[in-house]
Amino acid sequence: MRYYYGQLTKPLQGVYDTLLSGFRVYAPSIRIPDVEQGQLAEVYLRLKLDEPLLFYVTGYRCRWMPGAAHLELLPEYLFDKSKIRTHQQAVEARLSRLTRPLQGKPELEQELAIHDFILEQVRYDKLKKPYSHEILGPLTQGVGVCEGIAKTVKALCDRLGLWCIVALSEAAPERGIRYRHTWNVLRIGGQYYHLDATFDNSLQRGVKRYDYCNLDDSRCFRDHESLVFPIPACPDSRAFYYRNVSFTKPEELEKRLAQALRKKQPVFVFHWRGGGLNRQILSELLALAGTLAQARGKQASCSVNVPQAVIQLQFSDAPEPDITIQQANEGEAAPETQTVSE
């Protein structure tokens, strides 16, 4: 689905089409109209966001002829033609194998299956190898960074006919965000939602997390920076994953915690919307959990995603640190400690 293509002017759409045709046949050079370098860079970036199957294109150089009305673009490929074809076959086989069982399923079920594939089968590549920025990393190597993960989500959605785009945000060095970040926007049940599988991947500790599954704009941009390109508005919150375990009062949490402990669940994850998550509130909630856990011979501890107000309670036989503050963007942010206000 060529979402970013539709935001270009007609002349730049022509450049986009020419690049796409050339990349698909591994052309060593592509002749295009002489456009400004900034415009060309934007067209290339939009194309790469729209077309995750172009995993083998890593950049380009340009060559100009004096007085000519065109320029020659020289693509940079990750592999030679033979290796590209081999990797394309592997990617195609993997996409087919992953999506075949999901054909005809409800949109939400398809989305959650894709999300869970990322959490179960892909680990964040802190070395940031070149293929980790493309679908090749998550699909064939089991590693990826945010760009490769978001493109993989889109490739799987495209195969299923599920509306999906890759969202791209700016870096914010002054706040310790060293790199641009990518995630996805999906259309589920006619509504647009944010899905950040990379952040959820970073948060999981013994249980899959869905803190960034189907967020509206207000929640997403609590810890995502401003966008590079416009995306659809996401005002709806009805598909938020933790909607049914979103509490405003301690007594609501107490009832559900008691049920979880009776069922001997080692972990309980919930969303808190009963006011700002400061240390006093966290201590009160942890004390409540601790009292219930002690009645069953357990100790309670918690991990907290402060911006999204999602809390993971752990019940164990041995004492653990009371409160652990989690940072979802650990791969893209400069090392720093997230704090909870008093």
Regions found by a protein language model. Give the residues of each.
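Structured segments of extracytoplasmic/periplasmic soluble domains
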Residues: 46, 50, 94-101, 117-121, ...
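An N-terminal amphipathic alpha-helical segment
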Residues: 1-26, 124-125, 238-273, 332
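Short coil/turn segments at secondary-structure boundaries
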Residues: 58-61, 127-134, 272
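Solvent-exposed loop/turn segments at secondary-structure junctions
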Residues: 79, 121-125, 146, 171-175, ...
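Linear, non-domain "peripheral" regions
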Residues: 1-94, 262, 278-342
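Metal-dependent nuclease catalytic core centered on acidic motifs
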Residues: 212-300
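Hydrophobic/aromatic-rich core segments of domains that either
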Residues: 148-220
